[in-house]
C-alpha cells in the first residue's frame, strides 16, 4: 500500500480572511528518503505578491496526483491541514484535493494512546523517536510571512522535520491501530 505523509506551515489558523496562507508543504512517501517541499517563495510571482499561495496549493495537488497514494498520513490533518489546503484551493478557483483515504495520528494520540498531551511532540518524546520537532518564537513566522528568506528557510526545515518525526511515530504506533488490521 502506498502511503504519503503531509504537513503544512501557515501564517494563521484560518484560511479565508486574507491573512492566512500556506508558507510551505512537505510531503513524503513512506520509507522513501526524498521529501518533496513546495514553498511559497519558489513561485515566479512571489516578490509581487507575498501572500499568493496558489503555487503551493497547485504543487500539493500535482504531487498527490502524480504519486497517487492510497493513504495520506497527517497530524491533525483532518481538522487543519486538509481543510486549510482545500479552503485555499477553492478560494483560488481550483478543485479540492483529489479523493483519498486519510489517517490522522492526532486521532491516534487521542483515541488509542493516553499521553499527557495530544501534540506530535508528546507522542514523539514518549515513543522515543530519533528526530525531534523544532520550536520557534512567533516572530520567525511573522518575518517569514513578510518575505524573510532566512526565516522561511527555518520554517521549511521545521516542516520537513515534522514529516520525518511523523513517519517515525507512524511506524511505532501501527501495532495499536486496530482498525487497520489486515490493511497495513
Task: Tell me the role of every PLM-derived stretch.
Residues 1-35:
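Entry/capping segment at the start of metal-dependent catalytic domains
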Residues 3-5, 35-37, 102-103, 131:
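Conserved beta-strand scaffold positions in the cores of enzyme catalytic domains, especially
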Residues 7-9, 81, 104, 162:
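Acidic active-site catalytic centers that drive phospho-/nucleotidyl reactions
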Residues 17-18, 85-87, 171:
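Short amphipathic alpha-helical segments
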Residues 33, 115, 175-178:
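Short helix-capping/linker segments at secondary-structure and domain boundaries
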Residues 36-117, 121-122:
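Conserved DEDDh/DEDDy metal-dependent 3′-5′ exonuclease domain
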Residues 72-73, 122-184:
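Acidic, Mg2+-coordinating catalytic module of metal-dependent nucleases/exonucleases
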Amino acid at each position: 500500500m502506498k502511503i504519503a505523509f503531509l504537513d503544512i506551515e501557515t501564517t494563521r489558523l484560518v484560511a479565508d480572511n486574507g491573512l492566512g496562507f500556506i508558507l510551505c508543504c512537505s510531503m513524503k512517501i513512506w520509507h522513501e528518503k526524498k521529501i518533496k517541499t513546495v514553498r511559497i517563495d519558489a513561485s515566479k510571482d512571489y516578490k509581487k505578491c507575498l501572500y499568493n499561495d496558489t503555487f503551493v496549493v497547485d504543487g500539493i495537488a500535482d504531487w498527490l496526483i502524480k504519486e497517487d497514494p492510497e493513504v495520506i498520513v497527517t497530524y491533525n490533518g483532518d481538522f487543519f491541514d486538509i481543510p486549510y489546503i482545500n479552503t485555499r484551493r477553492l478560494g483560488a478557483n481550483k478543485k479540492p484535493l483529489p479523493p483519498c483515504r486519510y489517517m490522522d495520528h492526532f486521532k491516534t494520540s487521542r483515541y488509542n494512546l493516553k499521553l499527557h498531551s495530544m501534540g506530535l511532540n508528546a507522542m514523539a518524546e514518549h515513543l522515543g523517536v530519533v528526530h525531534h520537532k523544532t520550536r520557534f518564537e512567533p516572530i520567525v513566522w511573522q518575518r517569514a510571512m513578510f518575505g524573510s528568506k532566512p526565516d522561511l528557510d527555518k520554517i521549511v526545515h521545521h516542516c520537513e522535520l515534522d514529516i520525518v518525526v511523523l513517519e517515525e511515530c507512524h511506524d511505532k504506533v501501527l501495532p495499536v491501530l486496530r482498525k487497520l488490521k489486515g490493511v497495513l
